[in-house]
């Protein structure tokens, strides 16, 4: 295999997954009837799943310290695939002119959700990440997207998030800051780079 894991690493990964699956409630992963290419509820459900799964991963520093962007992405994909019997989540999937980190499609092959994963390297890199997402992966029909940023160093995290939000507001395609979804999750709308009337 391209990458091997120790028994301790596998144990940690299984524990994270089990904690997420067994912690039933409003974030029960199955939502096969609620997700569609136009559903805000389905979009919120995906974002909540990613947020809560990531929040649980924060407890296992020995595991995530070894992850690069691809490692984080691969860790989330099985969980995203468990959310619906009628949708498929894939990684490094070609869309438009490049390979996006996470692509969820329905059974007809219609894109439902696109996400790009990045390690935090300063707020100046956020604009490049948005450019990459909008210019390379998002077609005119794609509306539900996310930029997932992983930060291994939690020092001055509140200040970091404030700077990140302000930086995103400066992006040329910025349309509106909708607000904070959760402690470290923020929602924006952007204009499509090829059509300013198309909002993403």
Indicate where each model-derived feature is located.
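Pyridoxal 5′-phosphate
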Residues: 91-92, 101-102
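Catalytic cores of nucleic-acid endonucleases
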Residues: 119-172
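Domain-level recognition of nuclease-like catalytic cores that cleave nucleotide substrates
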Residues: 152-200
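Acidic-basic catalytic patches of nuclease active cores, encompassing PD-(D/E)XK
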Residues: 42-91
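Internal, Lys/Arg-enriched amphipathic helical interaction segments that engage polyanionic partners
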Residues: 1-42
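Short amphipathic alpha-helical segments
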Residues: 38, 42, 68-72, 125, ...
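Short acidic loop-to-helix transition motifs that present clustered carboxylates
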Residues: 95-99, 122
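Active-site beta-strand-loop-beta-strand hairpin of nuclease catalytic cores
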Residues: 103-114
């Amino acid at each position: 295999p391209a990458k091997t894991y120790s028994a301790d690493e596998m144990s940690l990964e299984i524990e994270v997954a089990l904690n997420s699956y067994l912690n039933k409630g409003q974030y029960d992963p199955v939502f096969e009837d609620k997700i569609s290419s136009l559903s805000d509820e389905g979009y919120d459900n995906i974002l909540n799943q990613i947020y809560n799964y990531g929040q649980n991963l924060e407890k296992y520093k020995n595991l995530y310290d070894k992850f690069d962007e691809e490692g984080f992405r691969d860790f989330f994909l099985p969980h995203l695939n468990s959310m619906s019997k009628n949708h498929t989540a894939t990684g490094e999937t070609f869309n438009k002119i490049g390979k996006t980190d996470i692509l969820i499609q329905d059974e007809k092959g219609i894109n439902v959700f696109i996400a790009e994963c990045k390690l935090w390297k300063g707020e100046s890199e956020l604009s490049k990440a948005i450019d990459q997402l909008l210019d390379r992966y998002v077609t005119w029909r794609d509306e539900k997207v996310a930029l997932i940023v992983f930060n291994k160093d939690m020092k001055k995290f509140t200040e970091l998030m404030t700077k990140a939000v302000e930086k995103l507001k400066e992006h040329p395609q910025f349309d509106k800051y909708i607000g904070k979804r959760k402690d470290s999750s923020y929602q924006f709308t952007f204009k499509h780079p090829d059509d300013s009337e198309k909002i993403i």
